[in-house]
Amino acid sequence: MNDRNLFGINVLMLAPCLGKFGGIETFCLTLIEDLIFRGATVRLLRKKVAGFEEDGSIDRNELEIRSAWTSGQRSRFDSEFVKPRDTIIKKAIQECDILHLHNPMIEGVWYAKKWDKICVMTVYNWRRNGWHPRLWAWRWAVAQADRRWYISEFVWDSWERNRRTGSARLPVVSRMPTGEIPPEKRKGFLFIGRWVPNKGIRILLEAYRKISPNPELWPLTLIGDGPLKADVEKIIRQNKIKGVDLPGFVSEADRHRYTKEAKWMVTPPHTNEDLGLTPLEARSVGVPCIATDDGGVPETAGKHALFCKRGCVKSLANRLQEAVDMCEAEYEQKALATKEGLQDYVRPLDEYAKNYLQLLHRI
């Protein structure tokens, strides 16, 4: 890391927040840890957005990650929740060396330009079409950033038909699980994500019910929480579906353990998913994926995944059955092949430090 020394550099991150630990929160903490280890001082402002409802998961995960840091490293990081147009945001931008926005945040770009601050942006969501003033303001904000990193080709294509200078695809990453488990010791299907409409959790339950595999050999583990929790529990109860495990919200360490122990990661959204982080985590430990042809998911699930039509119970059920019927030799080949191309897709975190230093004219 010595060639990416960030000592003395004050980084401000401004990210939208719904109050629950999700993809943006995961990536922010992963990147922040790398920056802290390189000597930077980092402040994270989590901007409350419509629908904000804190459930404690953000604080729990942040505490888990910070617990492994030294006291000196912890002293160079601070985070807090802020309201839109909070004076804290304005003051923090004035004091920083570089502003890293997570998604187009108009006030962040506005103040950065006003005070001639370097402004970089990670764009997580595909561009919506329409004539609403806010949509045009977002386009303006994205165009003004000194660097733009889109999390997938799917997202990038929606914003830039013609690639701009200063833009790149740089997928967000989490702290990837490590250490593979032998294929013969893995069991069942795993879903990780928010239990919200269009993530496919109800379709997955119905598809699993249709094939009714041996619950001992092929359990279905649903990790997460969300507004559909009552619906999920009702579907399981009314249909007497056997083999479904609901651990709820789990720590990062437990999430990694569940990922390694699963035979297949199932990612079935039908919402134009921007990226799909869990397939990357699964592939990093040789766990292949069953995924929909939705948004950026095919990019992260990899060419060796079993793909199904989005929103289609029958198509997903067919893929689940294919996985159940697959012989061990074929599965082992699939597990080995699923890591193919992963290193070409997931770029190292030091890309961010390198860009920060280039913009600050330190290298």
Please describe what each predicted stretch is.
Residues 6, 13-21, 27-28, 34-79:
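N-terminal strand-loop element at the rim of the active site
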Residues 25-30, 187, 191-210, 215, ...:
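A conserved mid-protein helix/loop that constitutes part of the nucleotide-sugar donor-binding site
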Residues 101-107, 123:
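Short His-centered aromatic/hydrophobic patch
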Residues 127-128, 143-180:
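Donor nucleotide-sugar binding/catalytic pocket of nucleotide-sugar-dependent glycosyltransferases
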Residues 233-250:
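Nucleotide-activated donor-binding/catalytic signature segment of Leloir-type glycosyltransferases, i.e.
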Residues 266, 288-291:
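Short hydrophobic beta-strand element within catalytic cores of glycosyltransferases
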Residues 305-314, 321-328:
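Conserved acidic donor-binding segment of nucleotide-sugar-dependent glycosyltransferases
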Residues 328-361:
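A charged, aromatic-enriched C-terminal amphipathic alpha-helix characteristic of glycosyltransferases
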